[in-house]
Amino acid sequence: MAWNRKHLLRLCTLLVMAIGLSACSISYKFNGSSIDYTKVRTISFETFPNRSVGFVWGPMESMFNTALQDIYMQQTPLEQVKRDGDLQLSGEITNYDAYNKGVGADGYSTMAELRMTVRVTFTNKSNPQENFEAQQFSASREYDASQQLSAVQDELVNQMIKDIVDQIFNATVANW
């Protein structure tokens, strides 16, 4: 008899949980975007030129532009068009520079910091209150100053680009 009660109690518990959960509605988008796809179907990107006042590293411009377009193509069903998209992104890389971060007892730099800043203008034709102009997005990475920048530059720039692209995505379509 105890065995049947035990199973009956478990069955009742599962039934109550199933009814309770079916009454709940949880909505979560795994891509993080909050776009109304009935109004927004296309996106256009202008090339973000490298107008840095600091260093100029040739591959950075194309790396950034590719990463920016990729995040929207991978995380939204938006169609990329050459111009006049429902969403429009334009801007420029305004800063890319290295700075001494820490000095050792011998007076030489021990840590250096690489910084990158991008200025972005965003237009949402279906929801103009989300537009912004000349908003700055930045990222930085530290590295051991005993290393040559050329030895760590590719990895650090990729990390900074990922950070900045995520910031832009969140500011434009994720509404965090």
Please give the residue ranges for each predicted region.
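Surface-exposed short loop/turn segments
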Residues: N31, Q74-E79, R83-F132, Q136-A151, ...
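Sec-dependent bacterial lipoprotein signal peptides
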Residues: M1-C24
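A structural "domain/chain start" motif
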Residues: W3, S22-T66, D70, N170-W176
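Conserved acidic
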Residues: V56, M60, T110, V152, ...
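Compositionally biased, intrinsically disordered linkers/stalks adjacent to structured regions
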Residues: Q153-W176
